[in-house]
Amino acid sequence: YVTALMRLMGYDNLIHTYTANDIFVDIPKDAEYKDSVSLAFALGILKDDYNGYFRPNSPIKYNDAIRLAVRALGYGEQAELNGGNPNGYTWVASMLKFPCKTADTPDTLKCDIARLFFRCTEVSQKEPVKWASDYVVYAKEGRTILEQADIISDEGVVTANYISNLKESAATDRETVKIDNVLYNIGTTKASDLLGCKV
């Protein structure tokens, strides 16, 4: 989970250049996720919440996943000021409109993490502006992960593809579709197969 979260936040390049420290006693020295965990710890995303143990073989609890996501987006201080773990983080997660678990089970399902990560891409991220040995200062204003990657997220009806057009006579080329009459590149999506559908 930590490695995926760090990649989602755009720290891929930092992960490979960061020198891992022996912060947690239960992480093997040759573990492929060790650098991600060390970087997350250095950025204040991951803290020593379990007395020196990372518990790499235990499934992540949804409350822990939310807590790490809240910290990664820069809202950890706000959560701590509102009661810390778990109430402060639950309050911030609610404010950020994080999804609830899909099933009432003790385990966190992959679909829960996928929905949480998708919501993280839409939340305004507070960007770190200052690091110290025991804290990180975040900017008040930030951009979403989607904005940082220049990805447009919108909903609408596919009104034209390369075969037909619902509103005009001309179709588009094979690499584009019109959604509500706005031309978009389809990229790796199957949008051209969804003429007349809401996407």
Regions found by a protein language model. Give the residues of each.
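Feature responds to low-complexity, polar/acidic, surface-exposed segments characteristic
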Residues: 2-34, 43-107, 121-195
